[in-house]
Amino acid sequence: MQENKQQQRAIAHNTGPALILAGPGSGKTFTTVERVRYLIEVHHADPSHILVITFTKAAARQMRDRFFARMDNQFFPVTFGTFHAVFFHILKTSCHYNGSSILKEKEKREYLRAALLTLPKKFYAQNDGKMDQEWEQGLLSEIGFIKNIGKLPADFTSEYVSRQEFMRIFVSFQKQLAQEKKLDLDDFAAAVCHLFRTNPAELARWQREYSYLLVDEFQDINAAQYEAVKLLCGGKRNLFVVGDDDQAIYGFRGSDPAIMRQFLKDFPEAKQIFLSVNYRSRAGIVETAGKLIGQNRERFPKQIVAGQSTSDERQDVCFVPEATQGARRMQGEKSTLPIPTGTASGISAAAFGTSWLPLSTDRSVLVCGFQDRRQEAETVADEIGKTLRQGKSCAAIFRTNADAVWLATALKCRKIPFLWKEKPKNPYETPVCQDLLAYLQFAMEGRKRKDFLRIMNRPCRYLSRQMLPDAEISFSALRRAYAQKPYMQEILHRLEADISRLAKMDLYAAVHYIRRGMGYDAWLKENAGQTPSAGESRQGQERAPAGARAHAAGKLERDLEAADFFQEQAREFQSLTELEEAMTAYEDQMDQNMADAADTAASGTTGAAFTTLPIAELVTMHGSKGLEYDAVFLPCCMEGVVPHKKSKNQAALEEERRMFYVGMTRAKKELYLSYTKGTKETPGFASRFLAECGWKEPKR
């Protein structure tokens, strides 16, 4: 392997601080491994005093394996570890902690619940006496966030409770940790900093232990980790950091790309080296991604160039690309597995009047706008099938897991093998889908009590379960039970008429009528706190904590998305029986498809009748970090999805742009960007990021 001049400068760096800005596909792992080798073989550094810190176990393992392979599998006692592993080793050695000292997830939730018992019930959601799990996880994430950024809890604005209440929760949580002598993972860095500041002897000990520090993915570091690393490197200042501020996407965990710029202030003598050649992606992908990320203001200015030609072949390969799960190199002939190429209805994308249009001169970047998500999912699934038949690795990358459901369904229907790395819960099992199903079942399959109990007060109809003694519901019996309440007669008459209408409709129309005609969507808004409920004034609603209002808005958004999903799925079936069978089979089919895909990846075959075949992967933008594929699909490139509608300020928008950039730069040969246009009633708009890439949407 022959390194380029930029890599050579980084590898040959001896002592003192250095900041290596490594763009996508620029060989940062190769450079880091070679630098460790160079320290040992050329500068005669003691390998036992070299510490390489990464963010994930997989990255640490990969770097260690590549180092030992480079050293002809001879053993050298270099330490490769994650921040958590390294910091816990220090705390275990110096402070006598052990494995049982680490707070388990179950214990963490118990501590939080104990802290919440001191709060008025109005501050948290209740569901049959149980706390809203999403709300609970949100609070735990906020507690971890302020620990990582080193912020005082009194200065933090929670999305869920007031500042005063959050302060009480945080203090109680930390008090329980101290009493039980436990350590939260998010406390590791702060605990190491406390040890180093209060015990100079221990600080000196660990500074002697690690004379050379190398930090990978430095853009993902948080304030607490950075402070600990600065203390550890000591007066020798042998701190070699590698990262790319354009790929900083973990702000929700406290990571801050501004720390990279702060590094140059803290270490003004630091050598700064740019690894600017992307050996992964074709020129069109590199240029298009560069246009996008150039819109960010808070970044190191840099110009990334392609190390590939505009053809599919590499022009200048000077290092072995990073091994990834996504980039499986298949041996032998390309697959002839008969994956269907048409959509479920046999209609191609072209028949809808859509086509993939080139965004780059080498046609490595293609864009397409679709009418709705179903059409987008079917067309992308067909394109994935074509890509797999050509023996290429590919992935569909989404902003959130929920966005992947449409494509997963389309792939499943076509029996296209895929691996869903972060599969969410069955979308049919959401409370909203179960409500809509209960309405359909009550109208079309008999008046069962269990279905009526679920729907009778959604929206509110003032019906009591005590008036429902029988297994089947009779509206005549209900009218007799409420004979003394004239207003209930009108409610029951309207409900019976609505149920009769539903029984005569097709599934799609029935769901639409439930939502609009029977007031289910309006009830969702009231239930989420978006409209004043009975007896509540608009002023009283507005006095709720801002965090509580934001949480309510998020809940409504998810509920309406679930209703949209169910309604679109209902369109596909001729009868309720067909829909029920599909819902029942969904989880089993999905699990089986994923198992088959995993077996395919493990064995490299699809059975005796077929040759080798890659499998498609579905992954989020966060989960795609560090991976690469021949072809990448980025569906759902719409405003409100990416950038996410919650991105209200410049910093949040820039992180969204970095996420999109990370997704784009996973592609080696082909990059497909798509969006949906929607209808007049519910229009969709292409993401501003497409325009920043140079895309001009055709006139409708």
Predicted regions mapped to residue ranges:
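Conserved helicase NTPase motor core
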Residues: 1-12, 16-20, 51, 59, ...
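Conserved helicase core region in the C-terminal RecA-like lobe
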Residues: 79-89, 214-217, 242, 400, ...
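Accessory C-terminal helicase-associated subdomains
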Residues: 337, 343, 390, 480-623, ...
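Helix-hairpin-helix
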Residues: 453-475
